[in-house]
């Protein structure tokens, strides 16, 4: 699987354009805003966009999803249904951050633990990793050893858990029980900031040590 990171919104959110090199079929993960910028990247790439994938329901990860889905005529998949209240609350999220109003969004398909997503010859595994939000999912390409982790884990940090229905202990369990076992050599693309590996975070991330700081 190939990827290109497209930073969007004032939150510098890592929207990812991912694709299968053999078929040139592609997906967008977490198009949080700046729809025109994303359209330009997709159109310049020469790829065929097939779907939009969402890790969770926060505005900075989904803000341009509806516009892009309509523009390209593609479905939206994810997150897990527990994040429905976030997607239905997008207008309130917009007002809270002083951004242009974003209408409620209902995906074409909710995702669950164990689901798979096909992009040409690429297969992504879906893992449900609650804690930052209750319906947060991540996408893992086992062959490429590449993980798109949303706001679950960052280089040197983890997602906030002080939002409605966030749970810090659940977040840490998601990381330790579901992500770290994927392997130390797995590279992850976080929702914000630089890439890292699960092995580096296992050893150095202060939130994953025995004495953990808490947001």
UniProtKB/Swiss-Prot annotation:
This is Hydroxyacylglutathione hydrolase GloC. Disruption phenotype: Cells lacking this gene show decreased methylglyoxal tolerance. A double deletion mutant lacking both gloC and gloB exhibits almost no resistance to exogenously supplied methylglyoxal, and is unable to grow at MG concentrations as low as 0.1 mM. Type II glyoxalase, isozyme of GloB, that hydrolyzes (R)-S-lactoylglutathione to (R)-lactate and glutathione. Plays a minor contribution to methylglyoxal (MG) detoxification in E.coli, compared to GloB. The two isoenzymes have additive effects and ensure maximal MG degradation. Zn(2+) 2 binds at residues 60-61, 151, 192. Its EC number is 3.1.2.6. InterPro entries: MBL_Glyoxalase_II, Metallo-B-lactamas, RibonucZ/Hydroxyglut_hydro. Its cofactor is Zn(2+). Binds 2 Zn(2+) ions per subunit. Zn(2+) 1 binds at residues 56, 58, 132, 151. One of its GO terms (molecular function) is metal ion binding. Keywords: Detoxification, Hydrolase, Metal-binding, Zinc.
């Amino acid at each position: 699987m190939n990827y290109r990171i497209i930073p969007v919104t004032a939150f510098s959110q890592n929207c990812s354009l991912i694709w299968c090199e053999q078929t040139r079929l592609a997906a967008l993960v977490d198009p949080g805003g700046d729809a025109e910028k994303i359209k330009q990247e997709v159109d310049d790439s020469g790829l065929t966009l097939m779907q939009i994938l969402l890790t969770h329901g926060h505005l900075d990860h989904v803000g341009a999803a509806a516009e892009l889905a309509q523009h390209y005529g593609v479905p939206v998949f994810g997150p897990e249904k527990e994040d429905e209240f976030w997607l239905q609350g997008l207008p309130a999220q917009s007002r809270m951050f002083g951004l242009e109003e974003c209408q409620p969004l209902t995906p074409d398909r909710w995702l669950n633990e164990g689901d798979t997503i096909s992009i040409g010859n690429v297969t992504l595994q879906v893992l449900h990793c609650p804690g930052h939000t209750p319906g947060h999912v991540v996408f893992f390409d086992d062959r490429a050893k590449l993980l798109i982790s949303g706001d679950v884990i960052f280089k040197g940090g983890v997602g906030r858990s002080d939002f409605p229905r966030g749970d810090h202990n659940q977040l840490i369990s998601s990381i330790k029980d579901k992500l770290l076992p994927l392997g130390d050599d797995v590279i992850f693309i976080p929702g914000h900031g630089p890439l890292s590996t699960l092995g580096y975070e296992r050893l150095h991330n202060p939130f994953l040590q025995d004495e953990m700081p808490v947001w």
